[in-house]
Amino acid sequence: MESSTGPRMPLLKYCSVATSLKAPGWDGAAPPWDLSFTYPFALQAPWLTGHKPLARHASSCPCLHVADPAWQGPGWLGRAGDAANTWVLARREADGFYYRAQIKATPELERQGVLLVEFEAPLVAGPKLPAQQQRVVLEEDVIPLSPSVGYSLRPGDKVLALWEPGQQQYGPGTVLLGLEMRDPQRASKEKEITVHFWNGKAAKVPLGGVQSVSLTIWKKAVERLHKSFTREHPRPLHWAPCCSLLGPITGRITNELPPDAPFLCPLCHHHACCQLLCQGCLCGCPPCGTTWWPLTRTSEVMARELPELEPTAQLLPLEGPKEEKVAMHAPLAVSSSSSSSCEQDGVENDLEMGPPQRLMVNSAVNTDPIFLEMPLRQSGLCQPEWRYWKRNGPEPCLGKPGTRYSNICKEEKDHKQQRAQTAVVGTTKELVSKATHMKPPRTPPGEAEHRKRSQSLAICQWNKNSR
């Protein structure tokens, strides 16, 4: 019975229930052929002796290439003996790509749904496995080759095309620039078409290296190619396999992608296997990326950046004098920032007292600058000149955070102002006496103390009234 999609395509007829191939006499016994060269893990997995090695379980991840029920159904290879000497594209389990191969006559295997194929070129499965010319593959991993029909390919068609320089590997892709004309004579002039492959690369492929496939076959080819790559190139930070090659399957997910659903990444489709997490996507979403090829490891990037960071350590001693200068000016900056709350509290007090007498002396009397530096030393570094001229700023309300600190600052400020006022007054009298050549009058000790107390009481009384 031929398929409606064409003589070379299998029937698009699926069963929604997981089934298994019937193989009488296999339970608890070895299969009629040796699987050691086909599945290298068969000898290391003792659970295979008690189960059917070719059973299709839809609820397991295909680490041993366990197929999905969507690929089952009678196809053109279901008739024993009819597929002998047929050229096909057979999938290689080691890397997931398709290669040209020829089916060998093995009716006993074809009845069980498997085929013995001979590849056109010897394949090396890995450093520990020998080169293999013949191999047993599943029926669903074989796609029959058809004559070149390049003139019928249009943009958007799904194909398997040669993508690497050796012209041996067939990978899934989408036609970008096809031959939309239906005239074979005009199409024969064009010998190449542009194909956008699954890994983001675009290349021109000859018509003889393109095989048109259905959307279902294309999706399954991409999915299996993806899983084969993740097993060969795991990422150390994100790799968390859900099933093991050397032990029972434990972390599997029971739901697979439906046949009619678009091929999305696991971040976009929640029914995908956890092996596909953080490995790439075909949906084009930003967190998934556009390719599955491994990126540069972070350790290599850090190793290249380390030599660039070494010269900065040699420049550190040159910055020492600058740091000392900054440290000398630090008390001024800290005192100005810490006293900002105190300045707002004493705005009216500063306006009433007016500018300090030291500035008035500077404008009235031309004296030695040594005497002008004395009040600055007595007042301390925590009182910059500009703080006395600040005329605006809201007063903090009672109960706000920082009220206790502002009260302490106010008391310290009043005490410093009192000392500076006394020192400035004494300095002014000395300057006047020197200018008039008169001796300053001696003040009794009791009168000086009485004057200090009266001034402090007056300031405290004013602060209470201002509150």
Curated annotation (Swiss-Prot):
Where do the segments described as Disordered lie?
Answer: 416-467
Q: Where is the composition biased (Polar residues)?
A: 455-467
- Signal peptide positions (record): none
Q: What is the name of this protein? A: Uncharacterized protein C11orf16
